[in-house]
Amino acid sequence: MDHKAYMYVLECRDGSYYIGYTTDMRRRLAIHNSGKGAKYTRARLPVKLIYAQGFASKEEAMSAEALLKRKKRPQKEEFLSENQDRNLLSYFEESWGVL
């Protein structure tokens, strides 16, 4: 895989979504679940990675993050459903074992 950055969606313990971007998906997920990640996720642990999309640049990932964050929850759910062909979750599960 030749992705330099990722836009990702976490499902929090309370069922809410957190959307972010990173250049190191494994490290970022570990930071979130250690309680040292974003303030939003710290109060809603544990979090589960449900979507990750790769991009050629950090700027592209940041743009995708900003677009998805602006959507209301039903639109986010529609995006997640319609873009499963772009979801790298199975790649990460195979690479890391259980998420």
Curated annotation (Swiss-Prot):
Tell me which residues make up the GIY-YIG domain: 3-78
Q: Which InterPro entries match?
A: GIY-YIG_endonuc, GIY-YIG_endonuc_sf, UPF0213_domain
- Superkingdom, taxonomy of origin: Bacteria
Q: SUPFAM superfamilies, from UniProt?
A: GIY-YIG endonuclease (SSF82771)
Question: What is stated as this protein's family in its record?
Answer: Belongs to the UPF0213 family.
Q: Which PANTHER family match?
A: UPF0213 PROTEIN YHBQ (PTHR34477:SF1)
Q: What protein is this chain from?
A: UPF0213 protein SP_1535
Q: Which organism is it from?
A: Streptococcus pneumoniae serotype 4 (strain ATCC BAA-334 / TIGR4)
